[in-house]
Amino acid sequence: MNRIYSLRYSAVARGFIAVSEFARKCVHKSVRRLCFPVLLLIPVLFSAGSLAGTVNNELGYQLFRDFAENKGMFRPGATNIAIYNKQGEFVGTLDKAAMPDFSAVDSEIGVATLINPQYIASVKHNGGYTNVSFGDGENRYNIVDRNNAPSLDFHAPRLDKLVTEVAPTAVTAQGAVAGAYLDKERYPVFYRLGSGTQYIKDSNGQLTKMGGAYSWLTGGTVGSLSSYQNGEMISTSSGLVFDYKLNGAMPIYGEAGDSGSPLFAFDTVQNKWVLVGVLTAGNGAGGRGNNWAVIPLDFIGQKFNEDNDAPVTFRTSEGGALEWSFNSSTGAGALTQGTTTYAMHGQQGNDLNAGKNLIFQGQNGQINLKDSVSQGAGSLTFRDNYTVTTSNGSTWTGAGIVVDNGVSVNWQVNGVKGDNLHKIGEGTLTVQGTGINEGGLKVGDGKVVLNQQADNKGQVQAFSSVNIASGRPTVVLTDERQVNPDTVSWGYRGGTLDVNGNSLTFHQLKAADYGAVLANNVDKRATITLDYALRADKVALNGWSESGKGTAGNLYKYNNPYTNTTDYFILKQSTYGYFPTDQSSNATWEFVGHSQGDAQKLVADRFNTAGYLFHGQLKGNLNVDNRLPEGVTGALVMDGAADISGTFTQENGRLTLQGHPVIHAYNTQSVADKLAASGDHSVLTQPTSFSQEDWENRSFTFDRLSLKNTDFGLGRNATLNTTIQADNSSVTLGDSRVFIDKNDGQGTAFTLEEGTSVATKDADKSVFNGTVNLDNQSVLNINDIFNGGIQANNSTVNISSDSAVLGNSTLTSTALNLNKGANALASQSFVSDGPVNISDATLSLNSRPDEVSHTLLPVYDYAGSWNLKGDDARLNVGPYSMLSGNINVQDKGTVTLGGEGELSPDLTLQNQMLYSLFNGYRNIWSGSLNAPDATVSMTDTQWSMNGNSTAGNMKLNRTIVGFNGGTSPFTTLTTDNLDAVQSAFVMRTDLNKADKLVINKSATGHDNSIWVNFLKKPSNKDTLDIPLVSAPEATADNLFRASTRVVGFSDVTPILSVRKEDGKKEWVLDGYQVARNDGQGKAAATFMHISYNNFITEVNNLNKRMGDLRDINGEAGTWVRLLNGSGSADGGFTDHYTLLQMGADRKHELGSMDLFTGVMATYTDTDASADLYSGKTKSWGGGFYASGLFRSGAYFDVIAKYIHNENKYDLNFAGAGKQNFRSHSLYAGAEVGYRYHLTDTTFVEPQAELVWGRLQGQTFNWNDSGMDVSMRRNSVNPLVGRTGVVSGKTFSGKDWSLTARAGLHYEFDLTDSADVHLKDAAGEHQINGRKDSRMLYGVGLNARFGDNTRLGLEVERSAFGKYNTDDAINANIRYSF
């Protein structure tokens, strides 16, 4: 019934109270006496929309809509929310507390709020509503008991099930305390929401009605509240909707239909939002204030307790399980353990409220169901670990199960068809029934482990369906048979399905929102296969039904009696009438022909083309496979997230990863039009749109994203971290094509719509981090932020992004195109055999032009060609780059090589070695330039110009231009304007023609050099007259000067003259001067002596292979020797070598002599370097030997050995570069000596040795700046002698002896080393061989252990030689048998 009440101010109540306008003596002039109790606004007779009230017309109406539904910028937890009016003027900030979570409020009409998992709070005069829904509305809970307060307009209805979608709100801790809610320190802010009649009020108090009650929700702020009726009621002037100081930044007044709607306050003592009261009355449409009933704490506590049976305690001492019996006729039951019996109450007939709650306690409890139990609205709460089982197949139904934190319950009881087991609580429920459980599961908190056991037929089904909601729970599968994946759904805010290493196939993923998580949290990799594509033969055929209801898009079959044909129709809407009989379409039916197969294919194609959507998240150790049939063009859209360690595979169709548009509350178009007519264009008509600017960022991480025949797009507000493997696929990173769900926020059903949305802010752009591999005509489009490498074969790469950073990239048969406005940085090496096309775009190599480099990070960049088009085309080559490829500039583009960075003076050794690659410059470029209208700048660059080149404007700073051959013997560099400073031009001549520099308009600068390479040696009589440089006549004579350059082994200085002719000034080559460069020759000679140094190393070790052979008893032996040493010589030469030898020999006793004969193998690894070269020699060899020891003390030793050398060296003189070569050498040596014993334990041993060798000659030929250069060393047979003396002392024990020894030797060459012949354009000269000698000294130990094992260790050095051994350590071991 509808009554009219008005709010009047009461001095007693210190607030507004509701008074009937028809009550006697309650006239407008009277405010002294309460004539009527606070009652209702309008009873709730039906369920309609959501919450609301009266708001002012200064603020956009969408603010109040989003506020009430926790959408837009009012998402739970949001802080410091700034509020602006429709004119963009600042109104205030919601900064007293973070935005509360309104999910506990009934999501349809907002007249009730969940305060306990099974109880809601509202007003008792709302007698018409019988159920509530929460979250996205895909649930319904029925009221089984209204629990009306006796003296207050309040009730706390009980629900039939435990709510799983949301958590109940906290309620006020103070309750009904007079004046409590005037305390601004404790309660600084109050928020309300409701679905009452919707009005907008202007500043004149004029109301405009926007909608009736229960149509939609609105919410906002209210001021502090005064109390009356002993604190049971509170009131405030909420109707003053223009008073922001009193009522906050979003004032709202409760209207008719808002009865029961909640009032929330932030409690600073508890530091959380609490439900303070429920709205009971108002002051009429557009009135001054509202009243609320404060939550009666004692009353609700009483009602909660009334629904509980006595707690059940399991006692181990009683023995046995709690035996649970139940009489379904009476609704009474009992749990008996031993002599103790606990009564319980279940459903009585249709009365669910008769069922009471049971609380179980006692450690490791056991319950056995003897009968099936229907507990009605009664729930089970487990405080301790329990096992619930049945021996006779009994079932249980009720409100649900609560498992406390830290508690584990083993549930071995099945449910019944049509009923869901609701589980909440932070503890773990393990479901371990048997066979097929026809009941469903709804879980809202904690963990549920599905471990259903097979029955005697092998059948397993833990539940017929599983719903995971609220964001709190996790469901774990013990195997893949527990539940049909297609019956799993993630409701409001979702939760986690942990597949636990089990691979599953989903034909549908029913995820309501981002909270849905599909995960695998174990080490065993699981594969999730998506198979949502509809096959034509799976399209169901429907027939006409008298209900006249169906699903739009379904296919219907009609046997037409009028035409004797079989007709097929597609339903267009959810209701229908008769089929058309003339094979036509109308508003309800679409006629699709007479062929069943064609009709089914049409339906399947439409379904597949529409695409599929997953709002949720993929996590953990997963592979995901989505392989669609060929020809399917629909998209799989993911606007949730992914973080998986496996591979996501997509074959055919489309795949879109994108951010998620922020969901907003919305109204019908008629409401939006009505508001727009008043100047408010804020109201939205759908939850998301392509035009909205607010999107949520999403992140996707895969180990690998494998694409085959796929159209892949990374949309706005999405970050992708992965390696993409694309085969015949299109990859668009920064795709403007995006999707919205027109059903977003309203459950698991979705309605996909494709459109475009381009991010204008960097924070909203897509981001890619990783590597892209392209193959088989794939296309990569980079439109947004990109950080990664590209490996492409037979594909295309297009860049339109202004923020692309390329890592190591290799493109084979693949073009790179930079489109207008693009700005890309290749920060690491870039190699392409195809063109790089830069169209009004910028490509930077190594670093951007505005960056200053203080570290050396050299990169190599190569392309078939670098092509610039458009006046805004830019190619920037940063410092420390090695560039290769021709540069072509069509228009007035810009090419810059070198940048402005400076090299750090504190380079590491590694960086110093890297810097040596640049030959003293910061940049190296090899290629030709075709840029007749462009501006080209080079700084600290070595340009190897391998073809005729042109530039409009050229600026050179500390740059060397080397003219090299191309298609013609000589090349020309032509520029209109040249500004050159401290630069050099290296030209070539054959005494007839030469390379040439031509400057057409102006030439400026200073300190520039001209170097000339002579390809042909002129005679002393030749007179040259060859123009090298042509410039305007006004050019300064000293702009260029002749400079000496090292070419080959010589210093070459051209002789230049300057002449004016035909308005031009020319620098003419008249001749040259040449002189030998001793430094280059010395470096070459040092390098050519490497083989001699290696020979000396081998000589010094010929006789140290075996250790002491005296007094050996065995007939044969094996030995191993390891030598490590280093040496040095003139010219900064150093080497370090490691030698490994092994051999075997046999002992022959010949009268007065022991003769040892054997074979040996050897390997040596040598690193050598000097001032101008470095490299490595690896040597392999073998030989044989014989050693004779006379009993008199005399001995001899002979050996012959062959060595093969593999040499790899980098030469930094005369342009020799890398030289890899092989060489061979032979050794033959003989040593004699005599051991004189001074005592039994001391001796002295004079020695003499002669070694002959054969070293192969070596010739090297190359070209240095156009000049033929060679160096040659002849073969040589070195002969080396050595004399010296060794003395030692032996220490002996029972089974061992140790001999210490010291030696001094003089080693000398008896023949000269090989001559070295050096040749260049200046002629040939010879560096004669030489003899060398040195003193060697060392100490050593020889040890014998038993009769078979001998160890030796020796340390040696040399001095006074041109080549010396700096240190050598020799160790050997010998075993005789």
From Swiss-Prot:
Its EC number is 3.4.21.-. One of its GO terms (cellular component) is periplasmic space. PANTHER family: AUTOTRANSPORTER, HEME_HEMOPEXIN-BINDING PROTEIN. It comes from Escherichia coli. InterPro entries: Autotransporte_beta, Autotransporte_beta_dom_sf, Autotransporter_pectin_lyase_C, Bact_Autotransporter_VF, OM_autotransptr_brl_dom, Pectin_lyase_fold/virulence, Peptidase_S1_PA, Peptidase_S6. One of its GO terms (molecular function) is serine-type endopeptidase activity. It holds the Pfam family Autotransporter. Residues 1111-1377 form the Autotransporter domain. Keywords: Cell outer membrane, Hydrolase, Membrane, Periplasm, Plasmid, Protease, Secreted, Serine protease, Signal, Transmembrane, Transmembrane beta strand, Virulence, Zymogen. Interacts with hemoglobin, degrades it and subsequently binds the released heme. Could make heme accessible not only for E.coli, but also for B.fragilis during mixed intra-abdominal infections. Has a role in abscess formation. Residues 1-52 form the signal peptide. The record marks N1100, N1101 as: Cleavage. It comes from the Bacteria. This is Hemoglobin-binding protease hbp autotransporter. GO terms for biological process: proteolysis. Residues 53-302 form the Peptidase S6 domain. Protease activity is inhibited by 3,4-dichloroisocoumarin. Cleaved to release the mature protein from the outer membrane. The signal peptide, cleaved at the inner membrane, guides the autotransporter protein to the periplasmic space. Then, insertion of the C-terminal translocator domain in the outer membrane forms a hydrophilic pore for the translocation of the passenger domain to the bacterial cell surface, with subsequent cleavage. Disulfide bonds: none annotated. The lineage of its organism: Bacteria, Pseudomonadati, Pseudomonadota, Gammaproteobacteria, Enterobacterales. Optimum pH is 6.0. The active site is at H125, D153, S259.
